[in-house]
Amino acid sequence: MCDEEVAALVVDNGSGMCKAGFAGDDAPRAVFPSIVGRPRHQGVMVGMGQKDSYVGDEAQSKRGILTLKYPIEHGIVTNWDDMEKIWHHTFYNELRVAPEEHPVLLTEAPLNPKANREKMTQIMFETFNTPAMYVAIQAVLSLYASGRTTGIVLDSGDGVSHTVPIYEGYALPHAILRLDLAGRDLTDYLMKILTERGYSFTTTAEREIVRDIKEKLCYVALDFEQEMATAASSSSLEKSYELPDGQVITIGNERFRCPEALFQPSFLGMEANGIHETTYNSIMKCDVDIRKDLYANTVLSGGTTMYPGIADRMQKEITRLAPSTMKIKIIAPPERKYSVWIGGSILASLSTFQQMWISKQEYDESGPSIVHRKCF
């Protein structure tokens, strides 16, 4: 690692999108869907030199003839063959680098099973022959990106949400809470409530259209009941959206009913607590002496925290739950969609981090379990 010229690669594998690029950059070079698609029917497209699988944007653009699979479910890798395809695509097609020439920083979900970290480590060294690698917890990287080492991160992506209290740079595992409610569930819920309005969206391809509607038009209401009343009495909240075939649909209270499920999971038929209660419960699992620091440094991260109005609503809900004298601050950086990646870029380019890498030599001596000793 003495040769300073070699940039480390930073790869943040999310359930919905993969973010990849070079350490020291301020944004990922490549952002593409974590999707592997396989043809539904053999040889429909004659002379297309049909491949047996497509990854990312190419899978997305050919989605009409493919069956789409997400190898990462709820933040955890469940299909390693497809995951390998995604990494291969990341290195060779997106970043156009030789992985055997660069250290690689990967990210993992909080509470990721030990066997999974070992498998990631094994694939990096044995399949891609990387000279060095490291596995970092996503939420911790988001906190670094906000310039902090202590705080609680609400990280909500496409497949899973976590509340992760972090003290002096270390995640506190006993207080981490996971909520299996995230972007994909909200997309499904929006499909359902749009169907109630008379618009039908059913296929995996149509789900992507609904995801786009969600990202462009949804917002979080500060007061849900009041917003519902406003929507019922006037058309001021209605917006129109043009579908790919040119048909225009109108959406009203669905705009805020969809993300309201984050605060009221009962909308989805789930018995779980909302993101505000989960954050509060996570703080309450921590030592009484550090709670003040967590309340004052509540950091939002991930694509599902991108809804307009979400920070104000969190502030209101947590103020309600916390002791009345407590200072509560919700930090919602504008780049929070990519803050895990940005934190990884910062970490991998620190001079003090260079001795933290797991080297190929250490891996050869100790095997995959080295990851538990060096990454925490």
UniProtKB/Swiss-Prot annotation:
It is an enzyme of class 3 (hydrolase). GO terms for cellular component: cytoplasm; cytoskeleton. The modification N-acetylcysteine is found at residue 2. CDD domains: ASKHA_NBD_actin (cd10224). The modification N6-methyllysine is found at residue 85. Keywords: Acetylation, ATP-binding, Cytoplasm, Cytoskeleton, Hydrolase, Methylation, Nucleotide-binding, Oxidation. Gene3D superfamilies: 3.30.420.40, Actin, Chain A, domain 4. Its main location: cytoplasm. Pfam families: Actin (PF00022). It comes from the Eukaryota. Signal peptide: none annotated. Belongs to the actin family. This is Actin, cytoplasmic A3.
